Amino acid sequence: MKLKPNDIYIPLNSIQFKIHHNDINIKYDTEEDNNNNNNNNNNNRYIDDNEKMKISEDESIFKSINNDNKNQQNDNIINSFNRGSNSFLFNIINFYKSPRFLSGGAVLLYVMTTYDFSASNFLLFNQMVVTIVILHILKHFNILKINTNFEKETIKKLMPLSFCYIINVLLGLDSLKQLNIPMYSALKRLVAVVILVMEYFILKKVSPPKIIASVVVMVIGAVVAGITDLSFNSLGYSLVLLSCIFQASYLIYVKKVASNMSTYDMLYYNSVLSLPITIFLMIVNQEIEYFQTFEHLYDSSFQAYFILSIFLGFFLNFCIFFCTSVNSPLTTSVTGQVKNIASTIIGAMVFNDIIIHPINILGLIINIIGSIWYSFLKLTSK
């Protein structure tokens, strides 16, 4: 290639293109400069990449910390829930495993035995108050018709009912603390005998011979089982027998006044008239002060069972009043013993507070046969 006077030629290995020496404004890059620029760019990219990686790592760490915090918070919430639910489920399992579940007033007795809560009158007082409040609410919304006007004749008629109810409940709870479940169930079937006698003298009612025979079979079974009970407890037997008398009186009174009063009226009056008795017993036993200083007062499980026992008390009383009004005191008594058949069998097999004896088992079987026979006779007579 021929060079002109004003041209400068630089070898291609040191320059990328040809320029005119007067064109000073033209920027050119040598291979060295390009290498430097490339190195700088690479360095810049490396720095940018490092910064991005660092930022990305920081963000990841920050997100990880946040996630860890959130996970820890969630774990704390879940663990707290699990601890609470497991505690409640554990109590539920223990409750259903408890022999007291198999008897009447299970929740009430569970509260008293598991938490060593001895203020039974205070608990019954709350049951009465809740019953009154519920009935007033139902009346206010015209769901039920309840006569809340007290008259002297009504008070005189129902006062024995309320007295027998309170005494029966208290004696039943105390006797359950002294006896095992099969023996308690067997002896409570003697209520049917007391009712047969009271129906004859008070209601002027004579039961058919087969009904009487089935009741006699139940009594024989109870006596046989009681004689061979190696864990004999004289106090427990005395309390449960007294409880039978007051329970029979209570059911007889319900039937006697049922013709002139609805089930809801009887339930309302019984609750109101029971209040003075329970208040008096609470004051005498200093149960209000006891409740205020009770060690499990703020235990959520105790609170749940306490409230549950109150509302179940209302439901149980309504069922007893209704069944007795529609049927008879004897039927209510025997029907209430049907679940005691399962109580007797399961209690004898599962729980270790029973001393097994062959004759004792025979007595329980005879007792159960009498209960089934009575139920069959009542069903076929309808």
UniProtKB/Swiss-Prot annotation:
Annotated GO MF terms: antiporter activity
Q: Where are the transmembrane segments?
A: 117-137, 183-203, 211-231, 234-254, 264-284, 302-322, 354-374
**GO cellular component terms?**
Golgi apparatus; membrane
An example Gene Ontology biological process: transmembrane transport
List the InterPro entries hit by this protein, alphabetically: Sugar_P_trans_dom, TPT_transporter
Q: Where in the cell is it found?
A: Membrane
* Keyword Transmembrane set for record: yes
Q: Keywords for this entry?
A: Membrane, Sugar transport, Transmembrane, Transmembrane helix, Transport
Indicate how the chain sits in the lipid bilayer: Multi-pass membrane protein
Calcium among the record's keywords? no
What's its job?
Answer: May be nvolved in the import of UDP-sugars.
Family according to the record: Belongs to the TPT transporter family. SLC35D subfamily.
Q: What is this protein called?
A: Putative UDP-sugar transporter DDB_G0278631
Q: What organism is listed for this UniProt entry?
A: Dictyostelium discoideum (Social amoeba)
